[in-house]
Amino acid sequence: MNKKINGVLTAIVTTFDREGAFDPMKQREQVRRQINAGNGIFCGGTNGEFFVLNEQEKIAVTTTCVDEINGRAPVVAHNGEISTRETIRLGKQIARLGVD
């Protein structure tokens, strides 16, 4: 988590199925498209619909992206909650997932 990040990081959307649930397979497709274009990713931010995701979904989105990238490109995840305490708590969880 302390490495220097270079290059383009695309703020990707979070994918959902027809029922409104997070769709990890479609998310992996999004990630692969960006990797193939030579980009790293920023997941779970404004384009990633962070404001409609619960904590489990935020972790699932980040886990899916980190897993799919598998060290081939940088991945940065949004971390922002209503309270500072919750932001710090979630940030610690997200940091353990392998984001850059």
Please provide the spans of the model-predicted regions:
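Active-site beta->alpha loop and helix N-cap motifs at the rims of alpha/beta catalytic domains
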Residues: N2-D100
